[in-house]
């Protein structure tokens, strides 16, 4: 097992949470981190999830308690050990005020970055891993600016699409609007950043 393994388990696309046979006496509705069943959370670099259950799993060590999460974008399921919540970077959705700040950030002038695509890719990859929307926005702005000057490499194009998806999906949920509408708002802000 690699030394950075965080205990997160990806489950088959159609795996039902009932398949884990969580013992009733160990099933919870709120964890010590305050996340509740039914709450929407962000799993860094993957997107918005919903907590389906909090409890043990027979496929891991007894005594470990997990968040049983369902990805909203594709309905795949994950289990994250509660003890690894900080390491994984699991967080609550941003609030309206933070989303307004995000749009202001998207509209600011783009900061200079590596001219070498490999250095730029490494730098952007580290930002994506944080799970903070501000860092994901910096990646999106950076790659958007580069794409206006030249074609993105295959890896950078995938990263651009991932960054856009992560921002669009969270903004849409927080603002209560359809994703295409959120995407238009983000595109407008990105255009403003290029106009400086």
Predicted regions and their residues:
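A positional/architectural concept
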Residues: 22-88
């Amino acid at each position: 097992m690699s030394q950075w393994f965080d205990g997160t388990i990806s489950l088959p696309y159609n795996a039902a949470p009932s398949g884990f046979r969580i013992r009733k006496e160990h099933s919870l509705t709120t964890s010590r981190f305050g996340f509740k069943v039914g709450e929407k959370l962000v799993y860094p670099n993957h997107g918005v999830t919903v907590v389906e259950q909090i409890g043990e799993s027979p496929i891991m060590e007894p005594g470990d308690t997990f968040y049983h999460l369902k990805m909203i974008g594709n309905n795949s399921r994950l289990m994250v050990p509660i003890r690894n919540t900080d390491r994984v970077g699991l967080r609550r959705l941003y609030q309206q005020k933070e989303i307004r700040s995000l749009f202001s950030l998207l509209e600011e002038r783009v900061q200079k970055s590596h001219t070498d695509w490999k250095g730029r890719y490494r730098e952007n990859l580290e930002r994506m891993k944080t799970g903070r929307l501000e860092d994901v926005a910096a990646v999106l702005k950076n790659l958007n600016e580069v794409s206006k000057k030249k074609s993105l490499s295959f890896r950078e194009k995938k990263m651009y699409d991932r960054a856009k998806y992560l921002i669009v999906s969270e903004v849409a949920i927080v603002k209560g609007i359809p994703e295409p509408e959120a995407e238009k708002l983000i595109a407008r802000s990105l255009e403003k950043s290029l106009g400086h």
